[in-house]
Structure formats: C-alpha cells, structure tokens
Amino acid sequence: STNLSDGKTLQENFDIEDVVDAWRNDDRYDFIVWHPAKTYTVKEGDMLSSIAYRARMPYWMILEANPSIDPDALVVGSDLIIPSKNELLPLPIVTHKRIVISITEQRMWTYKNGELLDEYVISTGVDESPTLPGVYQVQTHELEAYASVWDLYMPHFLGIYQGWPGFWNGIHGLPTLSSGVQLWASVLGSKASYGCIIMDLQSAEKIYNWAEDGVVVEITP
C-alpha cells in the first residue's frame, strides 16, 4: 500500500505497469483510498446523533463500534471510535459513474467519465428525519420497496445506506400509501421525506436503470 496523509492509504492491489501504461496513453487510472477508523473526543453538549451527523456516519455504526457507551449519557472527555468511511462502500466501486446530491439545493446530478449528464429536482429528509450527508454507493435495487413503519410503497428503490441495520435509506420515486394516495408530488424541491431521496417517477426509473450496484453516491449538506 502507499501511505497518504491522516493515515489514509491507497489500494494494495494495483499494478504499477497498468498505472504507467495509463499515463503514457493519457488514460484515466482510478485508485481506491482506504480511510482508517478515527477517534473522537466527546465535548460538552455533544449528542451521539450530532456526532454521527458531523462524522457522516450512521448513528448505529458508531454505537456498534463503541458497545460500552450509553448513547444518552456520553462522558465528556471520553473517546469514541468512528468507523472507517470505507465500511459505507462495501461493493466494488463503479469508477466511471457518480451521483451527487445537494441537500441545500435539493438537486441531484449524474456524471459519467467526469462529464455532467443530467440534473434532477429532488426532496430529501425533513429536519426531524434528515438525510445523512456522506459518501455511499448504490447497494440494492428493488422495483418496489415497502416501508411498513410508514405504510409507504417506494418505486424504483436504490438502497444507499442503512439508517439502522436492515432499514435502508435510498433513492426512489414518489411513494404511495396502501390506500393508493401518492405523497409529496407538489413539494419536490423541498425537504419532505423521512430520510430518503425522492424523485418524480420517470426520473427515478431512469436512475434505477442507469446506476448499477457499486455506483458512488455523494450527499453534501
């Protein structure tokens, strides 16, 4: 491996001859950067949810890495382990495609080989149930997912991170209740969901078919 700053390293399985060939041919060569786990020292007023949000790491993953803590009574001055960001990217990375989402702008952009393809109006999670900024990847495809806790059918669902073990947040089309009532069509472009990224039905189907498992999804505040 090759050491970088802050303990990061480059992937171990690259062939230097491939790198040289790419350079000679003016081609692109993608490296994978491995991030180490980090330590965070609890400060006055910290809550685990706010630490998780700032660390761009799901709450439950920090809790799992620190099984002895009481999340409702953090001890000021104690150290927490923040898991490696690479744990959020478990699949082989699709390097030539990327999805970028802005919570502030309520927009999504798709890129291929570094070139902008499309821009979409979206809705992310409301402040009480926010979408978590961070770098993730498409991990699941489900033509119609169902969230029983909210009675929501979610078409063309792409799972990108687990808000809690087994509970996926993702990208999908406008959801419907079991009664057939469609939600949030009139508020696209504003925060509306329980944490997922919502799109109109046609756009969601297009993204579903375009983004295979492994495509990186970058969510910015």
Where are these regions (language model features)?
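Primarily a LysM-type cell-wall glycan-binding module
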Residues: 27-56
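Exported/periplasmic cell-wall-interacting domains
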Residues: 64, 148-221
